Amino acid sequence: DELRDLIRGVGIHELAAVLEEVEDDVVADVIQQLEPDQQAETLAQLDRGDEVAELLQYGGESAGGLMSRGFVTLNEDISVQQAIDYLRVLRPPSDRVYYLYVVDSVGHLQGTVSIRDLIVSSPRTSLAEITQRDVHAVTANTDQEEAALTLQKYNLLAIPVVDDEGILEGVMTADDLIDVLQEEATEDMYRMVGLDE
């Protein structure tokens, strides 16, 4: 109701301008609360409307619905020096780079590589040689609580989200998943005492 009041006050165009500054998963959450005609109009005004629309196809309680597309991928066929050069050009925000994800030419998740390993490895070394292949991932349809528990179990800062073929789709961060665990714990507590939220 507050969101609908806000839209009446500022309009779809202004809402879209504000949403341009927010992560895709948050934008998707906001758009899900709009009426269908407002959803379509807002998506049409967003520069990254197609990406947000893809997130909307997943349930809000799934890993796909909560994932962010703000992550860095590196192709396993490049050298360490090429990876470093790419990162220098890309200049990803430090608050988004928990892991560097290594993919094959099709986009299948192969593993992760740390910035430390990039720095200490020979520039000519293939990224495939230093990739940590023991990576824990969830599928886009995984329930958010299960994804949060996986992240917690392995003490990760972020967990990659893949499709059914293993292609990297997005990343869920610990920040997102801590909120999920808190919500789930609250729901469980209410159920235990016989109350609904």
What are these regions (language model features)?
Residues 1-192:
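Hydrophobic packing positions in regular secondary-structure scaffolds
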Residues 195-197:
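Cytosolic juxtamembrane amphipathic/interface segments immediately preceding
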